[in-house]
Amino acid sequence: MAQLPPKIPVAAPGHHQHWASAGGAGDAAWADEFAEFAASRRGAHRRSLSDSVAFVEVAPAGCGAGGEFDRLDDDQLMSMFPDEGGSSAPGSDNGGSDSDGGGDKHAAAQSDDGQHAAGEPTQEQAAATSPTELIRDPKRVKRILANRQSAQRSRVRKLQYISELERSVTTLQNEVSVLSPRVAFLDQQRTILTVGNSHLKQRIAALAQDKIFKDAHQEALRKEIERLRQVYQQQNTKLSGGLAADHAHVHGGPPPVRAEKELMS
């Protein structure tokens, strides 16, 4: 909160008359210019109360006079201050004296601060009133409780599912540790059987080739046997024909049919 200006001292009437006679027209012109400058500054830019008070206190000291503001009336004095003080106490501009105006400003500022504090509740008050508002709305309370229960059930289901997965993983790991040696042994046996199978395949291929050779040799032998059989039959035929001719030569001429066969042969 901005600081309020101090009360402006009020000089005695005799001192006022002495300043008016001693100051002359120069001091009066300076006071009028200062009042106009304060009014123009008031319309152009807002100043805080502390800045205005500081300016008012420094200006007379620079001029070398102690009671120059006694000549100014209440309206000119109030025009030097920004609207902050005036807005807080609108009736202070029409006060009868400087002391009364300052007191009205102070009271108005305190009442403004009290209204501001009462109009804007603090965080503690908001936190204190929030449970009451929640209790006044039973549907909202039920909805919040239902959401919390649903979230709790969901968390319980997730934890159960995770525990089941962990148990399954542990069981599978135990089975893997038990079956790993057996799998390694079977893998080694498979390698050995693969090598034996390759040897057997090579032997089967060699036997198939040998069978082909043997089949060809057997076919050649069969043809040779057939040829020898034919030769044997021819020799038997010739031998039988020669014996018959010898028998006919001994006992007489051969019969005419046999003689023709011998001629054709």
Curated annotation (Swiss-Prot):
InterPro entries attached to this UniProt entry: bZIP, bZIP_RF2, bZIP_sf, bZIP_transcription_regulators
One GO CC term, this protein: nucleus
Biological process annotations from GO: positive regulation of DNA-templated transcription
Keywords: DNA-binding, Nucleus, Transcription, Transcription regulation
Record bears the keyword Glycoprotein: no
Residue ranges, compositional bias (Polar residues): 122-132
Region (Basic motif), start-end ranges: 139-158
Name of this chain's protein: Basic leucine zipper 6
Origin species: Oryza sativa subsp. japonica (Rice)
